[in-house]
């Protein structure tokens, strides 16, 4: 009898060669014309779960809009004509009307077995003693003995805004509710509205920059006879950046009695200042400061004031925190003399630009980045042109430097700084 050897090779079936080709996808869908947005859920308010306040990292994050690559469809995302009503009413077939009917929640239950599952507070369903059936316990929905459970369950509106007409009625109701005056606070009992007023931007002073300055104490050390003079001196004080023996700090100067008198005369004459008058201020305190500039998109602090029966607000350009120095560098008798002037052409141009930005639509992050890149490219091109013609500009530059020394300080463009003379005794 022949014996089969263990070393015999195993016969394998031949491997089939399939046609393999990597699939190629094309995406012909146009770009989305606007960024992705979060939509509020009208059914469940998110405030009942957590009080969420979006931070800057959430506002700056761009959510990716993921579309199928093989969708070769021309999608028109914005078509305002779809919301227009068709003046010509088209008749719909009776069979199609049956398909368009809403599923009514109040239909009568035809089956008798479904009527036996009603929950009443004076009956309790039979519970079978079993490890498998009763393992997870009785949930809150199965507690039929709770008083008023069936009444509370009937009040829950599960199919809210299911049809088109209910949504239209709910939207129209919001316009009617807005017309009703609201006098009482929504959460605090006893708090009622006393006066209603409009809130507008300060169109007159929007061109000026405002700063939010925080002090750690009273800034006035001079003694005044009346409290009104002290308050007027506090409002008219001047903060000036100083540098003394490699020390940088901010000094607060308080107007003198004669300076306050000049301010009152200007108010009576209805003029901003007197060009020939020199206003004197005395040193009050010295502070170390920390300044934080706020970009236009992240400005969430505004100043608000009541003027002409209208509330007005303005933006805060920067936050400044002042900390009092334990040891003063200048003398207590240091004096600051100011002479006011009208803004220069460059300053007036900046004011007009800021005033025009009030009526413009705010720019997105992408637009700001593209504008900065474009400005850097233009500056790079200007610097290359100047370096190529540096030999021709040298004598002209020396003449301009010599002429600038002779010219007065008022001709040079600077940003809203009065002429300052600091004299220390």
Curated annotation (Swiss-Prot):
One of its Pfam families is Paf1
Q: Name one GO molecular function term.
A: chromatin binding
Coiled-coil stretches, from where to where? Answer: 152-174
InterPro entries hit by this protein: RNA_pol_II-assoc_Paf1 (IPR007133)
List localization entries: Nucleus
Q: Which UniProt keywords apply?
A: Coiled coil, Nucleus, Transcription, Transcription regulation
Coarsely, its chief localization is nucleus
Q: What are the start and end residues of every segment in region (Disordered)?
A: 331-425
Superkingdom of origin organism: Eukaryota
Q: Which GO cellular component terms, listed alphabetically, does the Swiss-Prot or TrEMBL entry include?
A: Cdc73/Paf1 complex; nucleus
Signal peptide location:
none
What GO biological process terms are annotated to this protein in UniProt? transcription elongation by RNA polymerase II
* Extent of Basic and acidic residues compositional bias: 344-380, 393-402
Q: What happens when the gene is disrupted?
A: RNAi-mediated knock-down is mostly embryonic lethal. Embryogenesis proceeds more slowly, with embryos displaying defects in the positioning and shape of epidermal cells. Leo-1 partly mislocalizes to the cytoplasm, but nuclear localization of rtfo-1 is unaffected.
Q: Does the keyword Nucleus apply?
A: yes
**Keyword Transcription appears in the UniProt entry:** yes
Q: Which PANTHER family match?
A: RNA POLYMERASE II-ASSOCIATED FACTOR 1 HOMOLOG
Described by its record, this protein's role is as follows: Component of the PAF1 complex which is a multifunctional complex involved in transcription initiation via genetic interactions with TATA-binding proteins, elongation and transcription-coupled histone modification.
Assembly and oligomerization: Component of the PAF1 complex which consists of at least cdc-73, ctr-9, leo-1, pafo-1 and rtfo-1.
**Protein family according to the UniProt entry:** Belongs to the PAF1 family.
Protein's recorded name? RNA polymerase II-associated factor 1 homolog
Q: Whose protein is this, by species? A: Caenorhabditis elegans
